[in-house]
Amino acid sequence: MRKFSLLIVLFSFTSFVFSQQNDVFRVVFWNLENFFDPFVDSTLTYNDYTPEGVQRWTISRFYKKRNNLYKTILSMSEGNPLSIIGLCEIENTFVTTMLFQETPLKRHNYRAIHYEGDDRRGIDVAIVYSVDKLQLVSSEVVKIRNPDNKYFKTRDILYAKFYDKKSDTLHCFVNHWPSRYGGERETVYLRKLAALSLKSKIDSLISVSAEIPKIIVMGDFNDTPYDKSIIDVMGAVPYDKSSKSDTL
């Protein structure tokens, strides 16, 4: 079995710090909880987050949320820009631009990776990275397919490949798997489908890597580390010092 290094971040808000000699490499994931712009999207039937919608989402409320978010990210940075920020529940590129380019976060030189997905509410995932710490090589979405329902739509998995300052390759996945809405048992197979899509992409990376690939998987999985999608499909096990390098 090919060996690889993999970190799985399973929480809705968490951060990890890696030491690279004198450099600090911080990885953060955050579910921004309905970070919508206040404008009507004519391509969607879901427009709750607009001034006339159910949530009465005005431009002033949008700016208030945006300001609270950037202040929190600044406080996490501690004067040293975060290396990678994984986000979910963002509506579009407009909201990431307003957060990272139209606030004091702009001086930290972040860039956002985002693709419009198929979620019925229009919420997506994004990867934000520091261009001073990482060079983007490529990015793409990993689609989650349901062989029993060709009309099935959900949020994509976002994948990005980076080079760090030492020209080492880093692979990053950001996930927001199908929710438990409708019942945990009734929806568990949907999260298994997401896990299968993720595992397939990881396996393909491992198969073509000459060296041990460095892989970060983060997101809101709507499951625990002990659920079937993580244990049975991903094959992940709880970490301890005796864990082998060829296990998740």
Report each predicted region and the residues it spans.
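Active-site-proximal beta-strand elements of phosphoester/diester hydrolases
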Residues: 26-34, 54, 138-140, 169-179
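Bacterial Sec-dependent N-terminal signal peptides
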Residues: 1-22
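Active-site flanking residues adjacent to catalytic metal/cofactor-binding acidic residues
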Residues: 30, 88, 175, 219-220
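N-terminal, active-site-proximal structural segment of metallo-dependent hydrolase catalytic domains
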Residues: 17-103, 107, 113-123, 195-196
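Catalytic metal-binding/acid-base residues of hydrolase active sites
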Residues: 33, 91, 178, 221-224
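Metal-dependent phosphoesterases centered on the DNase I-like endonuclease/exonuclease/phosphatase
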Residues: 192-248
